[in-house]
Amino acid sequence: MKPKNKLIILTFFLSFFFSCDNKGMLFELENKSQKKIDSIIISNGYDEIKIKNLYKNKTRKVYLKFVKQKPKSDGSFFIKVFPNNLRKNFGYYSNGIVPSYSYNIFLEDDSITIEEY
């Protein structure tokens, strides 16, 4: 392989590697309940994201960034769903390092089911 081609490939991989944002988590929410969900809060204990009006049988992807304070210890996420006042703790992060997977969250009338993907 020519040196010029090696340089192009190396530049591509380095730019890809450094452009990856591993400072947050992706969550996919699916409303499987019989009605519209008024609001949802997902938090890591420091930062939170608020989602309004998730309609019946609809899906929404949201991204929670770790920006206010990078945790220096282990922790977990939690979700609150209104108006049902459902709350569930789930997942983990270690020393503020975000896991490499995401979460599917299924919201039902009286329960929350969470799967890693």
Predicted segments with their positions:
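Short, aromatic- and glycine-rich surface loops/edge beta-strands on solvent-exposed regions
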Residues: G75-V81
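Asparagine-centered strand-capping/turn motif at beta-strand->loop junctions
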Residues: F27-S33
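Sec-dependent bacterial lipoprotein signal peptides
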Residues: M1-C20
